[in-house]
Amino acid sequence: MRSMEDMSILVTGGGSGIGADCASRFCALGAKVTISGRRLEKLQHVQAQIGERCCIVQGDVTLAEDRQRMLDTCLAHGGGKLDALVNNAANMYRQPVDQYTEAFLRDAFETNVISAMMLSSAAIPHLEETTGAIVFIGSTHTKRAFPGASPYATTKAALEGLTKVMAAELGQRQIRVGCILPGAVSTELNLRAGLFSAEEASARYDSVAGLHALGRIGTGTEVAEGVEYLIRAEWVTGVALEVDGGIGLGVSHF
């Protein structure tokens, strides 16, 4: 497998959760990582924990000028190259099927899908130079139905489909493409979506732990290990890797 030493990696949505854990792990392995996000104080907190190998850039992935600035910052921090792009930025979108609004659905696809497509497209020339990798963060919401989560699940299903087609299209250019499908992980995403309060979090996560074959929810670091594998594995492309503690198995305990 390819070494991460001196890799240049861009991670969107790096101010907390899975993105921050990816940055921490990759920097520990010798990479230079640029993290992006909308909340500067969150990015600065992650950078302070990791150190000088981590560079930050404030921006919104839905804005073309911000996406270009993310790439430019990463190239400058990484010695003029890009080895991997991790499309992690996303929001949790929940809306009952009989209450859809067009504005809500458009925002969901703009944030979770279109921004990742456009950033990946812009990164291709740089990744071709390094025979690098693109990783999308999907979800096991595409494997197990959760009522009310159809907007979120649909955007994540789009990323799975995109992974396969993009991998087929970019294979001859030696760019690998993969998707990670995490199970339940304790992140700010659920709190920002208003699914439950910080005080309720522990009880809610305990309630879903049993849906996983391994009987517990995961950590951002465990998901980051899966992302690391897709970046480093030189003969793996087009896969949707379930890093989910077995929630996708649909285990029932009678």
Predicted regions and their residues:
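Conserved glycine-rich cofactor-binding loop
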Residues: G15-G17
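Substrate-binding pocket helix/loop in short-chain dehydrogenase/reductase
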Residues: P96-V97, F104-F109, V208
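Active-site loop immediately N-terminal to the catalytic Tyr-X3-Lys motif
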Residues: D98, R144-S150, Q172, G215
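Active-site helix of classical SDR
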Residues: S120, T155, T163
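Alpha-helical segment proximal to the catalytic Tyr-Lys
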Residues: P125, A168-Q172
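Residue(s) in the substrate-gating loop at a strand-loop-helix junction
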Residues: S139
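C-terminal substrate-recognition "lid" of short-chain dehydrogenase/reductases
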Residues: R216-V243, G248
